[in-house]
Amino acid sequence: MKIQLVAVGTRMPDWVETGFKEYQRRFPRDMALELVEIPAGKRGKNADIARILQKEGELMLAAIPKGNHIVSLDLPGKNLTTPQLAEQMNKWLLDGRDVSLLIGGPEGLSPECKKAAAQSWCLSALTLPHPLVRVIVAESLYRGWSINNNHPYHRE
């Protein structure tokens, strides 16, 4: 199974790239973690946010291979504990499809992305910086994988 992280934003600080790549490299070949970056729309004083969201959404959906299971990372989504995430990852694996996780820009995800998602996952009720979310998601997925594979990374 491949897990594709589709995220708005292309110029991340070095610590974000380093953190994401650290967890990405830990995954085994049969469960690859891939990052697809979508250019953020230009936001200015008089920017048309609805139009920016629509364009970002179109680019995100175009980046997802047909047949992928789509999960939005969004505030009204479901909060998962680490064991619940591990269980969800097992379900995705049994489903036999690759998974695309969507991380929106500063204003979130477009309505089209939310509609296309079969599931919605909420990391926190807190507002998190979008660059940090990439690292948190990568670590959380790796921790879920480690539980499912009896790897000593996760401890109760």
Swiss-Prot record:
Q: Per its record, how is this protein called by name?
A: Ribosomal RNA large subunit methyltransferase H
EC number(s) given by UniProt? 2.1.1.177
What does this protein do, in the record's words?
Specifically methylates the pseudouridine at position 1915 (m3Psi1915) in 23S rRNA.
Gene (UniProt)? rlmH
Looking at the UniProt record for this protein, which Gene Ontology cellular component terms does it annotate, in alphabetical order?
cytoplasm
**Predominant cellular place of this UniProt entry's protein:** cytoplasm
The reactions it catalyses are: pseudouridine(1915) in 23S rRNA + S-adenosyl-L-methionine = N(3)-methylpseudouridine(1915) in 23S rRNA + S-adenosyl-L-homocysteine + H(+)
Subunit composition and interactions: Homodimer.
- Which UniProt keywords are listed? Cytoplasm, Methyltransferase, rRNA processing, S-adenosyl-L-methionine, Transferase
Record Gene3D superfamilies = 3.40.1280.10
Q: Which residues bind S-adenosyl-L-methionine?
A: L73, G104, L123, S124, A125, L126, T127, L128
Q: Which family does it belong to?
A: Belongs to the RNA methyltransferase RlmH family.
Q: Where in the cell is it found?
A: Cytoplasm
What PANTHER family is this protein classified in?
METHYLTRANSFERASE (PTHR33603), RIBOSOMAL RNA LARGE SUBUNIT METHYLTRANSFERASE H (PTHR33603:SF1)
Species lineage: Bacteria, Pseudomonadati, Pseudomonadota, Gammaproteobacteria, Alteromonadales
GO MF, one example: rRNA (pseudouridine-N3-)-methyltransferase activity
Which Pfam families does the UniProt record give? Answer: SPOUT_MTase (PF02590)
